[in-house]
Amino acid sequence: MAASWQWENATAGAVAGFATVAAMHSLDVVRTRFQVNDGRGSSLPTYKNTAHAVFTIARLEGLRGLYAGFFPAVIGSTVSWGLYFFFYGRAKQRYARGRDDEKLSPALHLASAAEAGALVCLCTNPIWLVKTRLQLQTPLHQTQPYSGLLDAFRTIVKEEGPRALYKGIVPGLVLVSHGAIQFTAYEELRKIIVDLKERRRKSESTDNLLNSADYAALGGSSKVAAVLLTYPFQVIRARLQQRPSTNGIPRYIDSLHVIRETARYEGLRGFYRGLTANLLKNVPASSITFIVYENVLKLLKQHPTTKD
């Protein structure tokens, strides 16, 4: 497998990441605000549901509020998806080496996805932390608001130290299972659809068998499975990544503290706050990601680079 193939995957993944953020960011803001609102003294307004949240943010904060944290989200998503598809492709290539059958087992797809997810998490956690904090800023924010991405980085390092950039890394690493589940489900469902279509049209290659509607269905269905199994860890990470109060005391100390407090005051429901907004965002977002990724990859394969 040529090195250019890996860069084709990375490029297609980066373009897919950008397209996904551009289309769905406002729902990401809503989801994040629901996730951290534990009902115990918050600078955020109380929202009744997803639609109410969208209209309230638009009315009180305007378009800027709905797109809070957009710049780090674009950087984070573009870099994350680019790296993810690159590492994922490299891992699959390594596991396939020396095998007579090029098709990998579900376990090897899972291992490839987990490996890629862990590497991406370590590379991008600071970007996601800044994105979360910018999304939680409102006109009523109690502390001096960050003016943007660079100011947020500088202020966090100055006030909390460099280690603060990796708050939420533990649940983030656990969330590697999210991507692993999604990609394994995607690959296995993709095999089923390809096999069904190959029986009908034996003359076409795999690339031509699937269309954008297939990629949308595969991306959406695989995302639902991953979200339902791993969503509580997204809530835990978001709560850990909140900005400390004006006296510098964080609301939560670590992941176990979040789990204890959430279970005590909110019960199981607390771990699924923002789930509706999350599904409304991520199911179509995942479809967009895979539609763009597969089509950009197909385009790049039709016009390959000369480098190996």
Swiss-Prot record:
Appears to be a chloroplast envelope-located membrane protein lacking an N-terminal-located transit peptide. The keyword Membrane applies. This is Folate transporter 1, chloroplastic. InterPro entries: Mitochondrial_sb/sol_carrier (IPR018108), Mt_carrier_dom_sf (IPR023395), SLC25A32-like (IPR044712). One of its GO terms (cellular component) is chloroplast membrane. Pfam families: Mito_carr. Mediates folate import into chloroplast. The gene is FOLT1. It is a multi-pass membrane protein. The chain crosses the membrane at residues 10-30, 74-91, 110-130, 164-184, 216-236, 274-293. Solcar repeats lie at residues 4-94, 104-192, 213-299. One of its GO terms (biological process) is nucleotide transport. The keyword Coiled coil does not apply. Belongs to the mitochondrial carrier (TC 2.A.29) family. Ubiquitous. PROSITE patterns: SOLCAR (PS50920). Keywords: Chloroplast, Membrane, Plastid, Repeat, Transmembrane, Transmembrane helix, Transport. The lineage of its organism: Eukaryota, Viridiplantae, Streptophyta, Embryophyta, Tracheophyta. It comes from the Eukaryota. It is found in: Plastid, Chloroplast membrane. Disruption phenotype: No visible phenotype.
